[in-house]
Each structure stands twice: as structure tokens, then as C-alpha cells.
Amino acid sequence: MFKDTLLEGKRILVTGGGSGLGKEMASEYAKLGAEVYICGRRKSVLDDTVKEIIDAGGKAKAHACDIRVSEAINDMIDEIWADGGALTGLVNNAAGNFISPTKDLTPKGFEAISNIVFRGSFYITHACGTRWIKEDIKGSV
């Protein structure tokens, strides 16, 4: 459907890229020529996904990181930038959830989910965005 080199020269970070939709997106981006970075909390899951991508001929690297921690995000983004230049794309895929009827969802449960989805997405988008603006780079989220 797409030209095999569609994303050649692109450097894309997929949060929550070790499993599920994030893994599938990262794998497809790599097949289309992108250099892919994935992050998540479970290092072993990330490493398995990176191995699969590399074994399929792609380029990928993993960073274990909790996106709820802004300092950890900044450190990770600094490492990625130092590893070959600026990212050109960011996919905010990381999410948290658990099965619970709405009537049983507690404020603490909602906070656990929203810290990943809202705050984590903001922290990582802000970390990339401020660097893109500073370096006059057109990144994509």
C-alpha cells in the first residue's frame, strides 16, 4: 500500500511501544524505513519488541521510562537527541486502564489513568515540542 521507503530518514518515538497498538505502529514505521524508538515501563517487553523489529530488518531502540515522571522524560529525550539527532515524529500511545464499572471507579483509579494519558502525553509532547521550536524543526505529533 505504501512505498517501502516512505518513512526513510524519519526518527519516530512511540510511547507504550512494547505491546499492543504501540508495538504494531512501531513495527510498521520501521518496515517503512523509519528509525523507531519505543518507550514504556517494562524493559523486557521493550527489548523483545526491539529484537523483533531488528530481526525483520528495521531499526529500533528501547528506553524504559515512566512517562508520568517529567524528569525521566527529559532525560530520555536528551538521550534520543544525542543518539543521532532530533526526533521527527512522536506517537502518544501510552495508556493505562483497568476494567471497572463507572460507578466503581474511584478518584484514585481515575488519577492513575489520567496521570499516564493526560500528564504523560503532555510531558513528552512538551519535551519534544520545546526542542523542535528551539531548533526550528518541524516535528509531528
Regions found by a protein language model. Give the residues of each.
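A short, exposed helix-loop element centered on a Lys and neighboring polar residues
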Residues: T125-H126
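Conserved NAD(P)H cofactor-binding loop of Rossmann-fold oxidoreductase domains
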Residues: N93-F98
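Conserved glycine-rich Rossmann-like NAD(P)H-binding loop of the short-chain dehydrogenase/reductase
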Residues: A34-D48
